[in-house]
């Protein structure tokens, strides 16, 4: 889920290092701190370059810059859009390798009880180690704990891998879609919305 409405599109210790590969020790998910912003920015840049690699030209991909994303995350953590917005990070030991942002849905048909996974990403080098499932489970628990009874998220219509992952976690398409312009050249991508009742959402397994 590489986009985000309320946080950057995707803050003491600075974990802005290249993600480790191989065996993962002490994997966890937690609420982000302000000092995590540099690491989250780097992860988001890598996630976006990977997600849009077959959609955008290389010169646009090169503009996905960790420090730029980090500045926006730092501002969002210092002054959240609302008390119901939360940024979570996934860690391998002390190293941030993924992130998830949750909050109220901004969709036109949303109610006060409609929550949204606004962003979810794991660094490409750290995937297949359970971080995505751990972050999604933490995101669902966080939304439920803040009084939301549904969760939604938007994904690229062509992203079959993410679609399968979210289907397995209990989300399903609700027929909503949108077309977004994602660069100054006017490139348009289609996104579809997946939703789940938080009373029935299952625990995700990566």
Residue ranges, per PLM feature:
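Conserved short alpha-helix immediately C-terminal to the canonical SAM/SAH-binding motif I
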Residues: 135, 159-162
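Extreme N-terminal starter segment of soluble prokaryotic enzymes
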Residues: 26-28
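Active-site acidic-Proline motif in GNAT/NAT acetyltransferases
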Residues: 123-125, 129, 157-158
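Acetyl-CoA-dependent GNAT
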Residues: 2-5, 13-15, 22, 31-34, ...
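Structural motif
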Residues: 43, 146, 168-169
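Conserved catalytic-core motifs of GNAT/GCN5-like acyltransferases
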Residues: 152-155, 163, 167-193
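Conserved GNAT acetyl-CoA-binding A-motif
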Residues: 143-155
């Amino acid at each position: 889920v590489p986009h985000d409405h309320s946080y950057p599109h995707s803050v003491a210790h600075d974990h802005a290092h290249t993600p480790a590969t191989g065996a993962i020790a002490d994997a966890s998910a937690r609420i982000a701190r302000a000092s995590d912003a540099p690491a989250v920015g780097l992860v988001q840049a890598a996630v976006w370059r990977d997600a849009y690699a077959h959609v955008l030209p290389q010169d646009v991909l090169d503009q996905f810059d960790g420090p730029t994303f980090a500045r926006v995350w730092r501002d969002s953590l210092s002054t959240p859009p609302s008390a119901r917005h939360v940024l979570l990070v996934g860690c391998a030991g002390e190293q941030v390798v993924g992130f998830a942002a949750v909050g109220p849905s901004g969709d036109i048909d949303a109610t006060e009880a409609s929550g949204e996974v606004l962003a979810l990403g794991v660094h490409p080098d750290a995937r297949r180690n359970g971080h995505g499932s751990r972050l999604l489970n933490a995101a669902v628990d966080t939304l439920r704990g803040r009084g939301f009874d549904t969760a939604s998220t938007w994904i690229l219509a062509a992203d079959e891998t993410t679609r399968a992952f979210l289907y397995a976690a209990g989300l399903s398409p609700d027929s909503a879609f949108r077309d977004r312009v994602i660069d100054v050249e006017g490139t348009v991508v289609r996104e579809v919305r997946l939703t789940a009742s938080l009373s029935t959402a299952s625990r995700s397994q990566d």
